[in-house]
Amino acid sequence: MLVVLAAAACAPAHGAAYEAAFGAAARDEGAGRFEAAARGYDDAAKRATRPRDADQARWDAAVVTTRSGNVAAAAGRFEAIAADATSEHVAEAAYRLAALRIESGDADLGWRDMEQIPRRFPTHGVGHAAVRRLVQHADEQGARAGLEELHALERDLGATELVELIAFATAEHLEALGDDRAARDAFVRIADRWPYPFGAFFDDALWHASLLDEKLGLYQGAIEDLERMLRQRETTSLVGSYERQKYVPAILRIGELYRDRLHDRPRAREAFHRLYAEFAHSTLRDEALWLEAALWHDDGDADKACGRLGTLVREFPDSRYVPCALKQCPDLERARNSAAPPECHDYIARMTESPSERDEQRDGR
């Protein structure tokens, strides 16, 4: 009870008239009565006792006017907010005004306005959105035009936080243009300049660098890119491992690169086993055991292969690999309550083939 009273005491006093008007406007908006909602928000702005509340009501009126389809009125509202230095919505209003002009037939003025958004508001979220939109617009004329737009943005914004986004998009464009070596080097520079945990593109940059290293025939370099990413892996006693999106694909690719590109089967087995042993929350742990067992089997060590498959059958009784494991190792037994498929499917066996073997199968050789 005391907590509730304390929270109520700390709540801002909006004023009864403002709250009534704002609530009525919100109900009109929810019911699709957008013109009435805009008038209601205008009324709330007049009744506000705090400048911040009035500012929010004016913003909501502009947004709901856009929803009403009255483009001219919405543009006028956003323009007024963008010109009000006291508003908390200046940057958002400027962006929405530019976007509205682009989408409603005044594209030339809209794109000129959009060009100024990241330059005026480099630390605001709309700056990031504007950069992406400007590059996407330039890309309509081809990747080379997009790259030129990025170079122009870098000249003006190289000292701002937007330069990281610009650098990553530049590397992507170099890759799209087929300049693999320059793109690879650009991605590595991003990881160097903005390392984890501060770099927003650290993982993605190393992932792209690894793909390009593989394409360039630099297989060990491709592995090192991925291992560099995985060295930043964090653990916590509360929720297990903190797994970012690229971690599991990275360790899986390491195994595949050792197996298929470097033909280093022991290290491939080690990588696949790491996926099983170290990534406790991954849904690919059963696949990792299957891939590791396949390498033991191909090397003629049936005991090790069946040992790994036994772990698979015990720990993952519902896995799609269970019937294939039982087929390879007849001494293994399916769990009584297993929901695994009844039969081993051929596509699972093909998962262990190298790229050249898959090509031969496809070409009928």
Question: Where are the regions a protein language model picked out?
Answer:
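Sec-dependent signal peptide recognition
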Residues: 1-3
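Acidic, polar-rich low-complexity tracts and alpha-helical solenoid repeat scaffolds
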Residues: 6-365
